[in-house]
């Protein structure tokens, strides 16, 4: 009797787990389709992949850092999560009730998560992966000394006054400065460069 009860509990658990998986996760992404439904399915699956990679890199970063830096990384990561959720919700609400609202939210989630993934890798290697410094140097041209600061500001775009982003960026750039001597002001501009274009 106990074995039969355990069997039914197991079956019920499997069905419960299957019902909790979103419908789009069970459907195949069709990259050739531009219907909203397919864009949402593909966007969700892309976000899930990038988010899984980010979680893996976060764990690796925690292992590679000294105890004091681990505490700051945890704090910065929490600030980043609050920023990402608030920022992408704002983008969603800006389009809602339009059919593109979920697509805009997923695009924001993918872009901000991918940018954070690059930051976590950079914290482990000391090498920013966003191409910011290379692009700024190329834009500066021959007169690198004079043109570098100007090209960095142009690449970073307009000031971004979101308080959640500022808390996240300040914490991250403070950490990057301590670990790799990245200039705080340049780091802030570099992080603005990573923000989605529709900010």
PLM regions: where:
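N-terminal signal peptide c-region/cleavage motif recognized by signal peptidases
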Residues: 20-22
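N-terminal alpha-helical modules
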Residues: 24-199
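Bacterial N-terminal signal peptides that target proteins for export
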Residues: 2-12
């Amino acid at each position: 009797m106990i074995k039969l009860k355990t069997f039914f509990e197991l079956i019920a658990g499997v069905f419960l787990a299957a019902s909790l998986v979103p419908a789009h996760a069970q459907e195949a992404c069709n990259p050739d389709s531009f219907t909203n439904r397919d864009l949402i399915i593909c966007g969700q699956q892309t976000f899930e992949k990038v988010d899984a990679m980010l979680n893996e890199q976060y764990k690796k970063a925690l292992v590679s850092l000294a105890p004091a830096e681990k505490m700051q990384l945890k704090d910065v990561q929490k600030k980043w999560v609050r920023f990402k959720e608030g920022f992408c919700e704002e983008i969603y609400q800006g389009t809602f009730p339009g059919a593109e609202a979920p697509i805009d939210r997923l695009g924001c989630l993918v872009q901000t998560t991918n940018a954070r993934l690059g930051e976590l890798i950079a914290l482990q290697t000391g090498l920013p992966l966003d191409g910011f410094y290379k692009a700024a140097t190329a834009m500066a041209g021959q007169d690198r000394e004079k043109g570098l600061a100007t090209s960095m500001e142009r690449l970073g775009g307009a000031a971004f006054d979101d308080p959640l982003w500022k808390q996240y960026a300040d914490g991250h750039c403070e950490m990057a400065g301590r670990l790799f001597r990245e200039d705080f002001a340049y780091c802030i501009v570099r992080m603005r460069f990573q923000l989605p274009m529709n900010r």
